[in-house]
Amino acid sequence: MRKRAEPVPPEHESFGRAPLDRECSIKQKLRIPGTKGHYPHDSDCDSKGMKRFGRRYGLWSRLRMFLIFLLGLYIAIPFLVKICPAIQTQLVFLNLVRFPYFIDLKRPEDQGLNHTCNFYLQPEEDVSIGVWHTVPAVLWKDAQGKDLEWYEEVLSTSYPVILYLHGNAGTRGGDHRVQLYKVLSSMGYHVISFDYRGWGDSVGSPSESGMTYDALHVFDWIKARSGDNPVYIWGHSLGTGVATNLVRRLCERETPPDSLILESPFTNIREEAKSHPFSVIYRYFPGFDWFFLDPITASGIKFANDDNVKYISCPLLILHAEDDPVIPFHLGKKLYNIAAPARSLRDYKVQFVPFHKDLGYRHKYIYRSPELRQILRDFLGNTEQQ
């Protein structure tokens, strides 16, 4: 006959309080049917175990609910974008994302541009755009305390002009943009930059046609004051789409710029959106084009650089960093391969300049390149001796 396990004597009870999990395990092994409640700490074991189980179950329940919420959100977003194309339009323009947030665009000197004038133009009724005119650095002393009239008059002096068209998000006062203005100004260029309607302190609702018209208005304003001085157009990121739209229109009316510079360009907005890092989690989602790309096209947004370059008749320079995480390098290279053999560019120089990924210039830091000055001198001509 099996011997019944003896109860733990009270005087030895303290030795049984070693880790509770081990005690419970030993008791389970020694217990005989019918002895439930015989051990003094059985209720403690059951209580602790239930609490531990409850905590684990509660954690798993919350995690499961969170995962279900994420899955529901993941599935719902494509339908929201399809039903409300304005969401996708905002993702393209990002004009409401303004950074730096606390700068006064009326005071470019706060950004270190003490030879810059701020003013406003009105391309259309109910549309106003904020503009900065930065004169060549050699004129910075003369520019101190001068008014808009002086800045307009100095455009006719013997210095070339660059019209800069920025990308989405931010304003004309964005740091990487300001740093580029300084580089170009130090090389002897006037730099005209502005915020499209709906960006910064400019008034109006953004659209591709509206942005292009704003750029055309500023270009005509420059040409009316710059005399025979060269006028170049520089577009960056989304601004390359505005730039090719503008230059195509200028070429069609036979008033092309002296050169076009595209920094970090894409082929067209559909290919760019499909390659954008934001699209990674949906790129293989069934019906991706229908959900995400068709609403962009339906909103009248194309920015068809690949088509526009076939109708451009002026020298073309493309700059692109291999480590660009926003607009993949291969899109800039593809655009060059389309432009180089184009009939309209047959008599003009078309150049593609890559920047190695080890340099770390990514999407918006090509201005840091020590070679940029020489690249521009070789392509546009030297201005620093003037």
Swiss-Prot record:
Enzyme class: hydrolase
GO BP annotations listed: acylglycerol catabolic process; monoacylglycerol catabolic process; phosphatidylserine catabolic process; phospholipid catabolic process
Cytoplasmic topology ranges: 1-66
Catalytic reaction annotation: 1-(9Z-octadecenoyl)-sn-glycero-3-phospho-L-serine + H2O = sn-glycero-3-phospho-L-serine + (9Z)-octadecenoate + H(+); 1-(9Z-octadecenoyl)-sn-glycero-3-phospho-(1'-sn-glycerol) + H2O = sn-glycero-3-phospho-(1'-sn-glycerol) + (9Z)-octadecenoate + H(+); 1-(9Z-octadecenoyl)-sn-glycero-3-phospho-(1D-myo-inositol) + H2O = sn-glycero-3-phospho-1D-myo-inositol + (9Z)-octadecenoate + H(+); 1-(9Z-octadecenoyl)-sn-glycero-3-phosphoethanolamine + H2O = sn-glycero-3-phosphoethanolamine + (9Z)-octadecenoate + H(+)
Coiled coil: none
Membrane topology category: Single-pass membrane protein
Alphabetically ordered keywords of this record: Endoplasmic reticulum, Glycoprotein, Hydrolase, Lipid metabolism, Membrane, Transmembrane, Transmembrane helix
A single Gene Ontology CC term: endoplasmic reticulum membrane
EC number: 3.1.-.-, 3.1.1.23
Active site, per annotation: S237, D324, H363
Record's subcellular location: Endoplasmic reticulum membrane
Cysteines joined through disulfide linkages: none
InterPro entries: AB_hydrolase_1, AB_hydrolase_fold
Glycosylation sites: N114
Side of membrane Extracellular, spans: 88-386
Bilayer-crossing regions: 67-87
Gene3D superfamilies, per the entry: alpha/beta hydrolase
Chain's role: Lysophosphatidylserine (LPS) lipase that mediates the hydrolysis of lysophosphatidylserine, a class of signaling lipids that regulates immunological and neurological processes. Represents a major lysophosphatidylserine lipase in the brain, thereby playing a key role in the central nervous system. Also able to hydrolyze oxidized phosphatidylserine; oxidized phosphatidylserine is produced in response to severe inflammatory stress and constitutes a proapoptotic 'eat me' signal.
Family as reported in the entry's similarity comment: Belongs to the serine esterase family.
Protein name according to UniProt: Lysophosphatidylserine lipase ABHD12
Organism: Xenopus tropicalis (Western clawed frog)
